[in-house]
Swiss-Prot record:
Belongs to the heat shock protein 90 family. It comes from Danio rerio. The modification Phosphoserine is found at S225, S254. NCBIfam families: PRK05218.1 (NF003555). In the resting state, through the dimerization of its C-terminal domain, HSP90 forms a homodimer which is defined as the open conformation. Upon ATP-binding, the N-terminal domain undergoes significant conformational changes and comes in contact to form an active closed conformation. After HSP90 finishes its chaperoning tasks of assisting the proper folding, stabilization and activation of client proteins under the active state, ATP molecule is hydrolyzed to ADP which then dissociates from HSP90 and directs the protein back to the resting state. Monomer. Homodimer. Interacts with unc45b. Residues 224-244 have a biased composition (Acidic residues). Detected throughout the embryo and in low levels in the musculature. Expressed predominantly in the developing brain, tail bud and cells surrounding the posterior margin of the yolk tube. The keyword NADP does not apply. This is Heat shock protein HSP 90-beta.
Length: 725
């Protein structure tokens, strides 16, 4: 009793972090049909703990002094209605217990709850890093006993009522590792049945790299031979304890001495004995070491699910080996969808497990695969790396560089094979197109191969997407460049002033509508010998015949004075004003210099919270105003300017045209209110409202004086109107 009281006093109670408590409530109070995934999650956690201790032991073998066998045991107990999982992994310190199991929410907790409420499958839980809590699908109470080499043995316990307790454990020492005891709910006793446990482990965890042993209590008839003296003694003692009944029965029934001896012998030979049956549940040879021809797609699917905790099958798989000076085997999978945190910088990626001669080394080896391929899942098993390799040695390893090069090559082969199946490639591209574009930005060696995998909508592709190869095959004879436009959406770019003439002349324009496209085309200068040209930048040259060239020269001469006047009025707001060859129905547009940012890129950069303002200064687009010589607005403005170049109305109209062109070209206004006031002035003029009628409309208490609204004419306000950029 005193011992029990002492233990009770030592127990500390902690509240679950709010999001975790919410998640547990959701798990407990919602009906899920596939509760069996709890076992997969707990086995997976045990495997991770074993990986960690094995990795540590490579550099410090004394870490295994507390237990050399690396294994997972599963023990069902029918009488107590418990299912226990024991691993000899790294274990947890007291701080680990408190943080990992309750007080610090993983980044995926909230995301997983949102996914669940949106109808996602509970089996996704492992992908969000909160798999442990799936134990509450079947358990009313969970006890975790754990021992880390650097700390005492602790017990964690919770019935999921919003809190948990942690105390020093004075029970049976476990050496090192973690013991998870699930006190099953009354309606979940199927998980202490031998058949059910075997079925679930085979389904979800047969490719775990450590032996999973099931311990089941069974009964058997035990035969006792005469020469087993000790057992004979035990038998005699049992007979003595049973009292005098047996001799009496024998005396009554023993007419024939032979008979009695025989019966006695039989009793000695067979007794019912309880014993613990051990069975290893995952004897399967590592799948990557087998011949790909002998492996079915179902086996690949099962391995993929056990490797990744994904609830869906993979989209594609590449299984290969490299032999020669360097030997390694690899098995690479493309998932069906991108994980929720694909581009989260701080998160350690653990997508490719590195093995050396079938011994697991690590699962977050950044040197194994470039960042843009961080969605690839799989295993790499090297014959050449040393078993005790450290992370620092890996960074310098030439062997690893060769492995990495081969993995990238095989991934690109896999993507190219997938591209032949249009439906599956669409699924892949929807999920991972950003990664391919990031690859073009980062991987100069493979840029050409990656560019062949790109798909874009275009002015001629309708709702379908086209590859650059298909675009080139449709190019006109006199077309030397691939034309593209970047923007926020297909509708925006399709109706842009920039594509008017290009499309009217029958040239195809690619629509690039993702922010990453801007970075991608900065590096992708050409494709198949054809340069990529943005229709929003200066110097757009469309193939022209002699008549068109002649007309262009005439227009330039005709509008030369207007261009000069507009440049004077707009001053530093534009680099230059020129006659355009790209406009059809718009009066003017703003184009950017060849090496500056496009309007879309400027928008993206302004949205960066941590942007470098010094870069903004010199990279922000130098704006060029291009005017349409065939548009009646420009022709009338030219005539008005010829008549009187000092006309205030001309000045106001030029500024209004410039600001409107900024908006239609995708730029933002520095002072939208002043532009709005100008538009309202124009509306007033259009409706025939007198300027003076503006005064009585103002409220007496209004802080804004009538002069604050810039008029279209007037010396004092003209300068203010010029300030709008």
């Amino acid at each position: 009793m005193p011992e029990e009281m002492r233990q009770e006093e030592e127990a500390e109670t902690f509240a679950f972090q709010a999001e975790i408590a919410q998640l547990m409530s959701l798990i407990i109070n919602t009906f899920y049909s596939n509760k069996e995934i709890f076992l997969r999650e707990l086995v997976s956690n045990a495997s991770d703990a074993l990986d960690k201790i094995r990795y540590e032991s490579l550099t410090d073998p004394t870490k295994l002094d507390s237990g050399k066998d690396l294994k997972i045991d599963i023990i069902p107990n029918v009488q107590e209605r418990t299912l226990t999982l024991i691993d000899t992994g790294i274990g947890m310190t007291k701080a680990d217990l408190i943080n990992n199991l309750g007080t610090i929410a993983k980044s995926g907790t909230k995301a997983f709850m949102e996914a669940l409420q949106a109808g996602a499958d509970i089996s996704m839980i492992g992908q969000f890093g909160v798999g442990f809590y799936s134990a509450y699908l079947v358990a009313e109470k969970v006890t975790v006993i754990t021992k880390h080499n650097d700390d005492e043995q602790y017990a964690w316990e919770s019935s999921a009522g919003g809190s948990f307790t942690v105390k020093v454990d004075h029970g049976e020492p476990i050496g090192r590792g973690t013991k998870v005891i699930l006190h099953l709910k009354e309606d979940q006793t199927e998980y202490i049945e031998e058949k059910r446990v075997k079925e679930v482990v085979k389904k979800h965890s047969q490719f775990i790299g450590y032996p999973i042993t099931l311990y089941v209590e069974k009964e058997r008839d035990k035969e006792i031979s005469d020469d087993e003296a000790e057992e004979e003694k035990a038998e005699k003692e049992e007979k003595e304890e049973e009292g005098e009944d047996k001799p009496k029965i024998e005396d009554v029934g023993s007419d024939d001495e032979e008979d009695t001896k025989d019966k006695d012998k039989k009793k000695k030979k067979k007794i019912k004995e309880k014993y613990i049956d051990q069975e290893e549940l995952n004897k399967t040879k590592p799948i990557w070491t087998r011949n790909p021809d002998d492996i079915s797609n179902e086996e690949y699917g099962e391995f993929y699910k056990s490797l990744t905790n994904d609830w869906e099958d993979h989209l594609a798989v590449k299984h290969f080996s490299v032999e020669g000076q360097l030997e390694f085997r690899a098995l690479l999978f493309i998932p069906r969808r991108a994980p929720f945190d694909l581009f989260e910088n701080k998160k350690k990626k653990n997508n490719i497990k590195l093995y050396v001669r079938r011994v697991f080394i690590m699962d977050n080896c950044e040197e194994l695969i470039p960042e843009y391929l961080n969605f690839i899942r799989g295993v790499v098993d090297s014959e050449d790396l040393p078993l005790n390799i450290s992370r620092e040695m890996l960074q310098q390893s030439k062997i690893l560089k060769v492995i990495r090069k081969n993995i990238v090559k095989k991934c690109l082969e896999l993507f190219a094979e997938l591209a032949e199946d249009k439906d599956n490639y669409k699924k892949f591209y929807d999920a991972f197109s950003k990664n391919l574009k990031l690859g073009i930005h980062e991987d100069s060696q493979n840029r050409k191969k990656l560019s062949e995998l790109l798909r874009y909508q275009s002015s001629q592709s309708g709702d379908e997407m086209t590859s650059l190869t298909e675009y080139v095959s449709r190019m006109k004879e006199n077309q030397k460049s691939i034309y593209y436009i970047t923007g926020e959406s297909k509708d925006q770019v399709a109706h842009s002033a920039f594509v008017e003439r290009v499309c009217k002349r029958g040239f195809e324009v690619l629509y690039m509508t993702e922010p990453i496209d801007e970075y991608c085309v900065q590096q992708l200068k050409d494709f198949d010998g054809k340069s990529l040209v943005s229709v929003t930048k200066e110097g757009l040259e469309l193939p022209e015949d002699e008549d068109e060239k002649k007309k262009m020269e005439e227009d330039k001469a005709k509008f030369e004075n207007l261009c000069k006047l507009m440049k004077e009025i707009l001053d530093k707001k534009v680099e230059k004003v020129t006659v355009s060859n790209r406009l059809v129905s718009s009066p003017c547009c703003i184009v950017t210099s060849t090496y500056g940012w496009t309007a879309n890129m400027e928008r993206i950069m302004k949205a960066q919270a941590l942007r470098d303002n010094s870069t903004m200064g010199y990279m922000m687009a130098k704006k060029h105003l291009e005017i349409n010589p065939d548009h009646p607005i420009m022709e009338t403005l030219r005539q008005k300017a010829e008549a009187d170049k000092n006309d205030k109305a001309v000045k106001d109209l030029v500024i209004l045209l410039f600001e409107t062109a900024l908006l239609s070209s995708g730029f933002s206004l520095d002072d939208p209110q002043t532009h709005s006031n100008r538009i309202y002035r124009m509306i007033k003029l259009g409706l025939g409202i007198d300027e003076d009628e503006d005064v009585p409309v103002e409220e007496p208490s209004s802080a804004a004086a009538p002069e604050d609204i810039p008029p279209l004419e007037g010396d004092d306000d003209a300068s203010r109107m010029e300030e709008v950029d």
